[in-house]
Amino acid sequence: MVQGFKFSGIAAGLKKNGGKDLGLIYSETPAKVAGIFTRNQIKAAPVLLDMQRIASGTCQAVIVNSGNANCCTGAKGMQDAISMAHWTAAKLDIPEEQVLVASTGVIGEPLAVEKIQSAIPDLIRTLDAGGVSSLAEAIMTTYTVPKVVSREGQLGGTAFKVTGVAKGSGMIRPDMATMLCFVMTDIAAEPSLLKEMLLAAADRTLNRITVDGDTS
């Protein structure tokens, strides 16, 4: 795994089946960050929030839930996304603007944020450098196999590691759609270079996939 990152995934009661549904990625120091997002004109509250915050070029945590997408939820949905970041930042003792939010699941239903607030202390308590599998389980929706991969390589004579975690097996059409993908690395790169590499990789992979022909 990539050094400097910790992960966790727990059950907060958002899913009806009682499975893990709340995850956290935490960087021990502020990390350089880049991101790409759905091109759908209708964007969920967490997407809109992250598009604003990622412009700073740094991030230290990502809190993500499954079971509810917090999409088409209006002003209340945006406040809920902001609250998720606020509660996480307070418990981690980091700036609120350094926390990104992601949600996946049912569209158009209010998010049970009180359950998330209650679960955040346990979510942070269980952070572990080897906890990426728990994170992968926590972001699962309708499929049955957690998606985690790690690779090592050399760049200019310097060793590096990359770890990726993703969710999604349906409702995928080029340009991201409903899937989530988080990539962590110890490569020392500025946000502009990270964005360039991310776009190039996505164009050759994620943006060529169509499943169900649905971009919702």
Indicate where each model-derived feature is located.
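N-terminal amphipathic/basic leader segments beginning at the initiator methionine
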Residues: 1-42
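N-terminal glycine-rich anion-binding loops that anchor highly charged ligand groups
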Residues: 16-26, 54-62, 214-216
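A short, flexible beta-alpha/helix-coil linker loop
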Residues: 31, 68-71
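Glycine-rich oxoanion-binding loops at beta->alpha junctions
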Residues: 37-55, 141-155
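Glycine-rich anion/phosphate-binding loops
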Residues: 40-46, 74-83
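Short beta-strand/turn micro-motifs at beta-sheet edges
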Residues: 51-52, 169-172, 210-212
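Glycine- and acidic-rich phosphate- and metal-coordinating loops
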Residues: 60-67, 98-104
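Glycine-rich, mobile lid/loop segments that gate access to catalytic sites or pores
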Residues: 82, 87-206, 216
